[in-house]
Every structure is written in structure tokens, then in C-alpha cells.
């Protein structure tokens, strides 16, 4: 675990998806809970439950996989960390990038909490671009 909890979440999910693991365990923080809610709402993960072990809270995520055995396995999730502790990236609502022409999701940290690019455009607020998911 590093000091960048968002990068830890993204790396854990990406590694589990790459090795076809169906369950991922990530540390439970306010930021991770907000990001996981967005992933669940957008359909990138199937299920979330809270788990407590040795006085530490964890989120147990069930990933969504393609179940086609005829073709080679391809990753379903593509996640990329954008703003990081060494280089923060901010955007106003007009310049929030569209991922795959609107098919992907941009997660932003705004003054009203963590939200997707669509929600930020509707509320006309910008913020720090945390990550891309497609």
C-alpha cells in the first residue's frame, strides 16, 4: 500500500482483471467507497460488500467478466490514473475529455464530491480528473 489510495484501487482492479480473478479486496476509505459506487453504478463491477478483519475495513469487489471461452481472454476493464500526487490535473466542465466518444467514464473530484464526467457537465462544475475508465 502506498500513499496514493486511488492508484492502489486502480492497480488492484486492473491486476485482478488481467489474471481473471473474480474477487478483489481493497482498503475502505471515503474516496475508495465513492469510486466503487461509481464503478458499480456504471456497470463495471457486479457487487460490493464490506468486510472487517483485524479492526480494518475492506471492500470486497466482484468483477464482471466476459464468459466467452471460444476466443482468447480480453480485459474488460481499462483504467488509467490521470491526476497523481506529483502532477495534479484540473479541468473546467467545458474541457472535461470524452473517453471513446462518451462510451468511457471520467471520474472527477469536485467541490460537490466525487462524480462522473456526465454528472459534472450537468451540474456545470469542473474539478480534478482522477481517472479514466473504458
Curated annotation (Swiss-Prot):
Any single Gene Ontology cellular-component annotation: chloroplast
Keywords: Chloroplast, Plastid, Ribonucleoprotein, Ribosomal protein, RNA-binding, rRNA-binding
Assembly behavior: Part of the 30S ribosomal subunit.
Subcellular compartments: Plastid, Chloroplast
Any one Gene Ontology molecular-function term assigned to this protein's record: structural constituent of ribosome
Keyword Cytoplasm: no
Keyword field contains rRNA-binding: yes
Source lineage: Eukaryota, Viridiplantae, Streptophyta, Embryophyta, Tracheophyta
HAMAP family documented for this protein: Ribosomal_uS8_B
Role this protein plays: One of the primary rRNA binding proteins, it binds directly to 16S rRNA central domain where it helps coordinate assembly of the platform of the 30S subunit.
Name of this chain's protein: Small ribosomal subunit protein uS8c
Gene behind this protein: rps8
Family: Belongs to the universal ribosomal protein uS8 family.
Gene Ontology biological process: translation
Ranges in coiled-coil conformation: none
Amino acid at each position: 500500500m502506498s500513499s496514493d489510495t486511488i492508484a492502489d484501487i486502480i492497480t488492484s482492479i486492473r491486476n485482478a482483471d488481467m489474471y481473471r480473478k473474480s474477487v478483489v479486496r481493497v482498503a475502505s476509505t471515503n474516496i475508495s467507497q465513492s469510486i466503487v459506487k461509481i464503478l458499480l453504478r456504471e456497470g463495471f463491477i457486479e457487487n460490493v460488500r464490506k468486510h472487517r478483519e483485524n479492526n480494518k475495513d475492506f471492500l470486497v469487489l466482484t468483477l464482471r467478466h466476459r464468459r466467452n471461452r471460444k476466443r482468447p481472454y480480453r480485459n474488460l476493464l481499462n483504467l488509467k490514473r490521470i491526476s497523481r500526487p506529483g502532477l495534479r490535473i484540473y479541468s473546467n466542465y467545458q474541457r472535461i475529455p470524452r473517453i471513446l466518444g462518451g462510451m468511457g467514464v471520467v471520474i472527477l473530484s469536485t467541490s460537490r464530491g466525487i462524480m462522473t464526467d456526465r454528472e459534472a457537465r450537468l451540474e456545470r462544475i469542473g474539478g480534478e480528473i482522477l481517472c479514466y475508465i473504458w
